[in-house]
Swiss-Prot record:
It comes from the Eukaryota. Its EC number is 1.4.3.2. Belongs to the flavin monoamine oxidase family. FIG1 subfamily. It comes from Bothrops mattogrossensis. It is found in: Secreted. Keywords: Antibiotic, Antimicrobial, Apoptosis, Cytolysis, FAD, Flavoprotein, Hemolysis, Hemostasis impairing toxin, Oxidoreductase, Secreted, Toxin. GO terms for biological process: apoptotic process; defense response to bacterium; killing of cells of another organism. This is L-amino-acid oxidase.
Length: 31
């Protein structure tokens, strides 16, 4: 499974978006 939604700059460094409740696994590479 790949997680590649557009990432808001202020949250791009987080593994979890509090606002959206979206979780990313530790091995997910953020742009």
């Amino acid at each position: 499974i790949k997680f590649e939604p557009p990432l808001p700059p202020k949250k791009a460094h987080k593994k979890f978006w509090e606002d959206d409740g979206i979780y990313y696994p530790p091995n997910h590479n953020f742009p």
